[in-house]
Amino acid sequence: MEDKMLLYIADQMKHRIADMEDECPKLRIDIANLYYLSGMKAMGYSDYATSRSYFKVALSLLPTDRWVSQYKLCRHISLKLAKSIYSCGDVEEAQSILHEMLEKCLSIEDKLPVQALLVTSE
């Protein structure tokens, strides 16, 4: 999918996100993946404010038990969200996400990139 098309679809779907609370969990995960990819594209353009927005929407679409049922996706989104937020200059919010990640990550390998970003943000 072309970058512009992906970002266009994500932007159009934002208008309906609030209505998605009762949608099928699988659909919500698929849309969270779309927003994750959109956030990655925005990061690739160094548009951290936009990537921050996409990653926040992606995280909001995951179920409340996201650290159990969607561990890998949640970890990826959370780390990219923290990087985007940090790049926007909101160090405290980024650190808050990183501290939550340290509590939730299951392995040392998963915690290493979190620790690395946390060290650079302090």
What are these regions (language model features)?
Residues 1-93, 97-120:
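Extended alpha-helical scaffolding segments used for macromolecular assembly and cargo binding
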